[in-house]
A protein has these predicted regions:
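Hydrophobic alpha-helical segments at protein termini of multi-pass membrane proteins
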Residues: 1-176
Length: 176
């Protein structure tokens, strides 16, 4: 169960490291980024709960009438915004004074490692929570959730690198 939960994240970290083979990042920085990703998951949970609490404390309003709207809104406010903002915070904390952040590809590598740390922990929690159908859960999350975190991390790292290495031209992306 544990291997099936972590394998997709490990493979995607291996892939992004392979793509960065010209000037690879130190292994300790990669491990540090994965740990930052794990930590971002722990930070995202209380933020998600607080945001959902703010939204739903108003008596639900449109959410009580339209469950679909509630589900979509919950997915963005309760999942996407807290998760991605915490991963971005961890990326910023890691790279703000990092001497190894010396080329644009590095932003992508570190963002992916943070994202895969987050996705790996999330996968483990989901798979161990679904005791009976753990294989199906692991397979579906391997095909959907982990690649989603990977794609978002690549985009985050790309735009973070643009803002870092080309501050005047891409200043508008600095906080995305």
């Amino acid at each position: 169960m544990l291997i099936s939960s972590l394998l997709p994240a490990v493979l995607l970290i291996g892939y992004v490291r392979y793509r960065d083979r010209r000037r690879p990042e130190p292994m300790m920085r990669i491990i540090q980024a994965v740990i930052y990703g794990l930590f971002s998951a722990f930070l995202a949970v209380p933020l998600a709960m607080a945001l959902e609490g703010l939204v739903y404390s108003s008596g639900y309003g449109i959410f009580a009438v339209l469950p679909f709207v509630r589900g979509v809104f919950s997915a963005f406010v309760g999942a996407a915004i807290p998760e991605e903002s915490m991963k971005l915070l961890m990326l910023w904390l890691m790279l703000r004074n990092c001497d190894d952040f010396d080329e644009a590809m590095d932003g992508i590598v570190y963002a992916v490692c943070i994202g895969m740390g987050f996705a790996g922990l999330e996968n483990v929690l989901y798979v161990f929570q679904s005791e009976d159908g753990w294989a199906t859960t692991a397979l579906m999350r391997s095909l959907l959730a982990v690649p989603g975190h990977y794609i978002f991390a690549v985009l985050m790292g790309f735009f973070y690198s643009l803002a870092h290495f080309y501050p005047r031209r891409y200043r508008k992306y600095r906080y995305f």
